[in-house]
Amino acid sequence: MLKNRIKLVCSDIDGTLIKSDKTIGELTYKAIHELVKRGIHFALVTGRFKTGVLPVMETLSLTDKEISGVYDNGAYVEVLGQPTSSYGVPIPLMFEVSKFASSYNARSVLFSGEEWVVEEKDKWWARINGFYEGRGVCEPFEETVRKSRMRNDSEPIKLVLRLDDDVKMAALKKELNILYPSLSFFLSHPDILEVSLKEVNKASGVSAIADKLGITKDQIMSFGDFDNDVPMLKEAGFGVAMKNGTQCALDAADYIAPSNEEDGVGKTLFSLLL
């Protein structure tokens, strides 16, 4: 039975844990606190940079010393506040990808330290700056790299490509996969293309946490809704997709939960685990 087996619960954030208005359902809030109370480890697994996750932790009334985190789709992992693994795309390669993507009119965004960075303001500036609580910076990317090295950041610099043309995005993704076989390119949103090392994804991040805690694959339960959640849904002993999820996520899951708008994570945890 799941109740006697699961020792680590992992959850995606956007479209899974939180509702479209960025709130967390009452049942989900209670369920996560009950997990922590019972000694079942909980981890947030997301494409967001850690800075973008801190408001979610605040909403949960939990700190990074109480729960673990997989950030940047697996590029940076912390276990109970301690950095565990960090796998960034080499800077020269990152700049090369950014330059090529500009030929498709894709916009590059870097995430570094507590900042997100663009080289020039565009139509996404206000929306992203609001999402990241005013931490946006407009500067040459070379300066971003210099500052990160001066700070000796644990979390690697992350590159994201934004393009709101589905046809162009598909063509760009296809060509990048051919040109850069050592990298992985995947959508975390219809207009957001993530860039990472080939072997790095949410599943590798979850595995890093499990290894550190001495937890086996069959003792992991994971929640997700999008294509980039598929690796961790498959990696977990019990994968749960949200009803609002993509077809790829639904196909990869062992169980379908109510949607994020219906407090699906909380309902499922209380129904199956707590």
Regions found by a protein language model. Give the residues of each.
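Conserved ATPase-coupling elements of RecA-like P-loop NTPase cores
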Residues: 20-24
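Active-site metal-binding loops of divalent metal-dependent hydrolases
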Residues: 13, 48, 74, 224-226
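Mg2+-dependent phosphoryl-transfer enzymes with acidic/Ser/Thr/Gly-rich catalytic loops
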Residues: 3-8, 25, 178, 194-274
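A general structural motif
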Residues: 3-6, 39, 64-66, 105, ...
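Non-catalytic pre-domain segments flanking phosphatase-related domains
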Residues: 1-13, 30-33, 37, 215
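Active-site phosphate-binding/coordination module
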Residues: 26-127
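Conserved acidic, metal-coordinating active-site core of Asp-based
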Residues: 96, 100, 104-107, 111-223, ...
